[in-house]
Amino acid sequence: MSADIRQAAANAADAEVLSAAGTRFLVQAYGNVSRADDLAVHTEQYFGRDYIARELQAPDVSYTIAYDADQIAGFVKIRRGTTPDAVPAAAAIEIQQLYVDAGQQGRGIGRTLMDHAVAAARDEGYTGIWLSVWQDADWATGFYEAYGFRRVGTAEFRLGRSKFMDYLMWLALDDVS
């Protein structure tokens, strides 16, 4: 990762900037395949300032932000306590969101955020990490597979009226050096 990129744990004061960045990153990822009204509803529900503020207070959720100077270049959101049946371990955390700004991709930011998630999972005694990723997002699926994740199932993801099929992916921490 570039020397001018830094990471920080998010806190309540970050709700507004996380809301704006999450909305921007979601539109970058899904804007050309989703209806504008569906994106608007989804971003208000899951990236609205009030929603993010509540999540930043929740004990089972944590965000880590990657900054380039004073701008958010990406973030990872970790959720504890949810594991689908397809995941081969009960003691797993979920990477619920990992986004890197489209203009910042290729700089190692995603890998650094993933390394942070792996370290957090290990520190907290988990045996693995799971996530879901849109099946047509070859760039994201390729990133996760290169990191060591493997596909263990599928799930439907709804973004308003738009339906997407996601891969459920699993990473055993014993497989990561």
Q: What residue spans do the PLM features occupy?
A:
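Acetyl-CoA-dependent GNAT
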Residues: 7-15, 19-32, 37-103, 111-116, ...
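Active-site acidic-Proline motif in GNAT/NAT acetyltransferases
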Residues: 101-103, 107, 135-136
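C-terminal "cap" of GNAT-fold acetyltransferases
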Residues: 2-4, 11, 89-93, 127-130, ...
